[in-house]
From Swiss-Prot:
Record keywords, A-Z: Ribonucleoprotein, Ribosomal protein
InterPro entries documented for this protein: Ribosomal_Su5_D2-typ_SF, Ribosomal_uS9, Ribosomal_uS9_bac/plastid, Ribosomal_uS9_CS, Ribsml_uS5_D2-typ_fold_subgr
Top-rank lineage group of the source organism: Bacteria
Gene3D superfamilies named among the record's database cross-references: 3.30.230.10
An example molecular function term from Gene Ontology annotations: structural constituent of ribosome
Name listed for the protein in its UniProt record: Small ribosomal subunit protein uS9
Positions with biased composition (Basic residues): 113-128
SUPFAM superfamilies, per database record: Ribosomal protein S5 domain 2-like
UniProt gene name: rpsI
Gene Ontology CC, one term: cytosolic small ribosomal subunit
Short name of one Pfam family: Ribosomal_S9
């Protein structure tokens, strides 16, 4: 099997994933998963598609993460891994879609509007 790559985005985060046959090693920006995401919840989010398909020990995954915060980066990585696994085996798409791993979450920060302190907040109104 050659290297399969995919891209995932979430908020301001972009994840580029390279999946190859291996022993289940996940590397993010040249660091181990446990070093990059010390939080077990974020590690779990990244591993979710692999765990759902029971292929965690079959592939080595190299991830380049860019922008955003920890949560956005972990969810971008999850989407990219899901897309790469679908490229490898298209029959897995239904299982991953049922779990919601294939859908790109479009929610992002709403822009600040002129004449207001934030996107929706108004300056204090004085009646008199």
């Amino acid at each position: 099997m050659e290297v399969v790559n995919a891209i995932g985005r979430r908020k301001a985060a972009v994840a580029r994933v390279f999946v190859s046959e291996g022993t289940g090693k996940i590397t993010i920006n040249k660091r181990e998963l446990e070093k990059y995401f010390p939080s077990s919840i974020l590690q779990f989010i990244v591993k979710q598609p692999l765990a759902k398909l029971n292929v965690a020990e079959q592939y080595d995954i190299k991830i380049n993460l860019d922008g955003g915060g920890f949560k956005g980066q972990s969810e971008a990585a999850r989407l990219a891994i899901s897309r790469a696994l679908i490229k490898i085996n298209p029959e897995d798409k239904a299982v991953l879609r049922a779990e919601g791993f294939v859908t790109r979450d479009p929610r992002a920060v709403e822009r600040k509007k002129p004449g207001r302190p934030k996107a929706r907040k108004r300056f204090q109104f004085s009646k008199r």
